[in-house]
């Protein structure tokens, strides 16, 4: 989903509409397609989804969690079981990139966040899909209202 949205240019010009650093570092969140429209108030952001141009419907992505020792991910189900959490393949570490969503586990669409510190309280509840491997100082400098000029895929 994220790769497809980058290729479509969905993130180009979107705003980081939620930056939480106080009282302790938490996340920088962006990717709301509504934020491309500069007249949209920041208070209205956080609920936007990617609207698929072919279907004119919101593209919603189920929660996806991958556990060590299992061949396939589990979809659509939150886990808070400590014995399962220890087997998650991707957890919330500083620099983890994850899908933002509403309370419904299958409501992720385009919005994402970057963890500013380890966030074990989110493990098993939100899908981590990437990691900042360089440039964490850029993430640390993001301010609410900053915009993504252009998102590009980097091939190894």
Feature names for model-found ranges:
Residues 1-156:
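Cross-family detector of peptidyl-prolyl cis-trans isomerase
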